[in-house]
Each structure stands twice: as C-alpha cells, then as structure tokens.
Amino acid sequence: MKVLGIDPGTATTGYGLIRSEAGRVKAITYGTIVTPAQLEMPLRLYQIYRELQALLMEYKPDAVAVEEIFYNRNSKTVITVAQSRGVILMTAAAAGIPVAEYTPLQVKQAVVGYGAAEKKQVQLMVQKILGLQQLPRPDDAADALAVAICHLHSYRLSSFLESSATKAGEKR
C-alpha cells in the first residue's frame, strides 16, 4: 500500500509518500511545495493544486492522508491553511483517491505513542520507522511522513478489526 501524507500550508505544504510491503515501511519520496509570498492567493492555491496533481499522477498512491488544522490564535493563518486543505482534498477527490484526515494528536499518538510529543521526538520516530539515515527535512516533509505513517497504522488496525469481526461472525 502506498500512502501520500500531506501537511497543508499556503507558503509550504509538506508531502511524504511511503510504501508498506511485507510488514516493512519505506519512504519513496518526500519534500515540500513552496509558493512565493508575492503571488496572489488564488495563484498560490493553483500552484499547490498543480504540484499535488503531478505527484498523484506520478506515484499513484492508494490513499492520501491529510493533517487537520490545529487551533491557532491567528485566524488569518487558520483561514489560509483551510484554503490549502480545500485544494488538497479536492485534488485527491478529483483523482479518485480516498482521503483520510488526522489531528496532530492522532499523528503523535500513532508515531510516538504520546499525544503531547515534541516535534523532535516525532521526527526521530519517523526516521527510525522508515529506516532513514538522517532526520527527514524540512519539518513540513517530516510532518507529512508522520501523517502517512499514522494512516498506515490506522488502516492496518481497521483491517485487522474487520478481519477479526468477520472471523467471529463465521464461528457463530
């Protein structure tokens, strides 16, 4: 299974593509989509759309996992991140790829096992889980890889629970 994790933003959107095969998880690619601050918002959003669409066409992930917006006192930041999330969700939907959304708390719990983990702890666990030689950089890409790992854990758990429920139903 291939999962594309996304850490949304207007200035910088992180992405991280992972693959799970035979119980092993590997990073395929990761990086950022950076939009110039001098561009008007519609053009920045269009750039995110174009670059994400190219990633989806090239790598054909089985799922896209997007981090939800966390509370921020700056309402302008929340609005611009929400706009980029809308573009991301629409781009994945248009490509026919299932989308899952996770809170930062869920991501930290899935990757580190502790919902109040520090950013550095998350990065170290992402490095360890994916067997990377160095910490994934930049931070937005590391966060996106963590979101993808979170989805993979969630998918495995739900598949296991479905399988267990089916087997329990067959025994009746």
Swiss-Prot record:
DNA repair listed as a keyword: yes
PROSITE patterns, alphabetized: RUVC
Cofactor(s), names only, from the UniProt record: Mg(2+)
Main location: cytoplasm
Residues binding Mg(2+) 1, per UniProt: D7, D140
GO biological process, one term: DNA repair
UniProt xrefs under CDD domains: RuvC
Molecular function terms from GO: crossover junction DNA endonuclease activity; DNA binding; magnesium ion binding
Catalytic residues as annotated in Swiss-Prot or TrEMBL: D7, E67, D140
GO cellular component, one term: cytoplasm
Keywords from the UniProt entry: Cytoplasm, DNA damage, DNA recombination, DNA repair, DNA-binding, Endonuclease, Hydrolase, Magnesium, Metal-binding, Nuclease
Catalytic reaction equation(s): Endonucleolytic cleavage at a junction such as a reciprocal single-stranded crossover between two homologous DNA duplexes (Holliday junction)
Family that this chain belongs to: Belongs to the RuvC family.
Subunit structure: Homodimer which binds Holliday junction (HJ) DNA. The HJ becomes 2-fold symmetrical on binding to RuvC with unstacked arms; it has a different conformation from HJ DNA in complex with RuvA. In the full resolvosome a probable DNA-RuvA(4)-RuvB(12)-RuvC(2) complex forms which resolves the HJ.
Designated name of the protein: Crossover junction endodeoxyribonuclease RuvC
Species per Swiss-Prot/TrEMBL record: Syntrophomonas wolfei subsp. wolfei (strain DSM 2245B / Goettingen)
Lineage: Bacteria, Bacillati, Bacillota, Clostridia, Eubacteriales
